[in-house]
Amino acid sequence: MLWKKRKVLYFAGISVFILILLLLKLNSKPKANVWPTSSKIVIYNRIPKTGSTTFTNAIAYDLYKENGFSVLHVNMTKNRQVMSLPDQYTFVNNITTWTERLPAFYHGHVAFIDFQRFGIANPIYINIIREPLERLLSHYYFLRYGDNYRIGLKRSRAGNNETFDECYSRGGKDCDMKQMWIQIPYFCGHYHFCTEVGNPEALRVAKQNVLEKYLLVGTTSRMRDMIALLEVTVPDFFKGALGHFDSLDANRAHLRYTKKKIPPNDQTLSMIRRDEVYKMEREFYDFINNLFDAVFKKATNGISKADDLVKLPLQYHFEKIKPS
């Protein structure tokens, strides 16, 4: 009889325990998709000939010791800017689990990768773009005359002194408007249509990614303003960046300056400005420029001075705190 009572109590206890577990499971809220290391990784998917070498070397590589972070270059095979889906997965997995390197600043000529597609929160994305024709001209003459960064290196078009005007008039490859289709794809990402020259969907997605996935995108002409914004927005990486940038001599503050550039004539400019690819890239540039200008003015209370930005007090405070 005693054994039967104990058996009943035993099964009753098990039933209550199972019931409690079920209730806890039903009442528990699903955990948010939080990646604790997301704020410890900055990705700068840099675009060629936009001042990216200056920004990377004069800021990231100069400040990593003082601010205590790692800097890593993402070297893309055969100068590709996109990865296969498996490579995207391993890339996301590698940099989010490589805890020994955190906090980390990654940079490389690679199109935007959306970490959220793999169930992980995106890191801090930043970038810099340049007026599209200026960027193309810089790249065109860079291939022929090189720059002030790696002086002894012979470039692929060395000895070819054809001007951009001459190239454009004969329909040359180096000055083809397909060569201008580069900044939109970098922000569009890895969808198949991103690299399709002149695809309107690529422009739409690029704009959307800038708004939703990037912390900040600046322009080459306002690099100093961008550095000031980053210093107060991501101080763990960019503390002291503006003062350091201002202390650099002219050569270090403008690395990879193309040695010789010949401005195109009015006829060439007129034809390029009517080209649909240029119009789209220019629309994207203006979109970024206007967005950055609005962010900067808001951050500086309309003063629009980088020097004042790092000194401005907070525009909010906490009060009525309970428990006191």
UniProtKB/Swiss-Prot annotation:
Species for this entry: Caenorhabditis elegans
Active site: 107, 109
GO process annotations (BP): heparan sulfate proteoglycan biosynthetic process; positive regulation of multicellular organism growth; regulation of axon guidance; regulation of cell migration
Membrane topology: Single-pass type II membrane protein
Main location: Golgi
Described purpose of this protein according to its UniProt entry: Catalyzes the transfer of sulfate to the C2-position of selected hexuronic acid residues within the maturing heparan sulfate (HS). Involved in cell adhesion and guidance by specifically modifying proteoglycans in the extracellular matrix and on the cell surface that are essential for axon migrations.
Spans traversing the lipid bilayer: 7-24
Record flagged with keyword Transmembrane helix: yes
Name listed for the protein in its UniProt record: Heparan sulfate 2-O-sulfotransferase hst-2
Tissue spec. comment: Present in the hypodermis, muscle, distal tip cells (DTCs) and in neurons (at protein level).
Positions on the Cytoplasmic side per record topology: 1-6
Disulfide bridge map: 167-175, 188-194
GO molecular function, one term: heparan sulfate 2-sulfotransferase activity
Gene3D superfamilies recorded: P-loop containing nucleotide triphosphate hydrolases
Keywords: Developmental protein, Disulfide bond, Glycoprotein, Golgi apparatus, Membrane, Signal-anchor, Transferase, Transmembrane, Transmembrane helix
Subcellular location: Golgi apparatus membrane
Xref: InterPro entries: Heparan_SO4_2-O-STrfase, P-loop_NTPase, Sulfotransferase
Family of the protein in this entry: Belongs to the sulfotransferase 3 family.
This protein's GO CC annotations: Golgi apparatus; Golgi membrane
Assembly with partners or alone: Homotrimer.
Gene deletion effect: Worms are viable but display axonal and cellular guidance defects in specific neuron classes.
UniProt cross-references to Pfam families, sorted A to Z: Sulfotransfer_2 (PF03567)
Glycosylation sites: 75, 94, 161
Lumenal side: 25-324
